[in-house]
Amino acid sequence: MNRQKITWLQILQGWSMLLVVIGHVTLTGIFENPQTPVSATIERVIYSFHMPLFMFISGFLFYFTKISRDLAYKEVVFDKLKRLGIPYLFFTFFTFAVKFIFSPFMKRPVELSLRQFTDSFLYPSSNPLSEMWFVATLFIIMLSYPLLKYMITGHFKIAVLIIGSVVLNLFFPPDIFLLCLSNVAYMFLFFCLGILFCKFDIQRFLSHSGSLLLSLLLFIALNLIPDCPILLLNLTGIIFSVSLCLNLTPIVSGLFSSFRDYTFQIFLLGIFPQIAIRILYSKIPQNELSYWSLYIISILLGIYLPVFIAKIVEKIPNKLIRCCFGL
């Protein structure tokens, strides 16, 4: 993978993380609040594709860093336990402590019990840091490394993989919360698409301005259709995002460079200052000025406070501490 391809992917990572942070603002604590129609529309559009985009990027990187190098299964599992498992464990403990101390201010307070702690792993969506469902889902999908490596070795097997992934996405029961199995089934398709994009360099077809315009118009049109199938929104959002970042790379190659190398740390830490901003908003006079001022502050803090913390942690010589923060 040449430098330009790496750059577009870095921009895509920054873009996806920006979407996540904006999607987590929710100052009123009510998702898609009709009292704030502009931000509600922003939330609706972002949530139509941002997590599938994250999974697509993860699949792309998984092929580039693991599958293409034909790493041993135990090496892949050990690496992901270190990179995903340790932060999961650390931030589960950390969030339990924070939510217990500040329980009067929490929308989802916790109780310090063995049952709730165990459920945080068996049912990741119940984790005190709700975003951990994605980490658990990603880890479980990555455990299928031998299957994925085998299924992309021939055209027929690739066709079976795609069809099977679509079937899982559309028809797997949506309410199986044990080990995030419903999320695993839904997100598996986008992870596989990321793998295939990297393997076959499919993104080269999206690097032209015509592709960007067409994907943008299609994405807008589908978002304007009431009750549009969510899978179509997922896919068009991914295609538009990839094309956008490919087209931006020759123009602004340093876009998002101030935070795009710390996307996992932002994902883990960004929600905490954003929750603090929500609490602050609930305590002050609420008007357009205070809303949009804190909206912007929430985005900036959600991005740059984790970056600041990550840069400090990077300088700590203790490897375990760095691993706790995904570094």
Residue map of PLM features:
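Alpha-helical transmembrane segments and their immediate juxtamembrane cytosolic regions
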Residues: 1-327
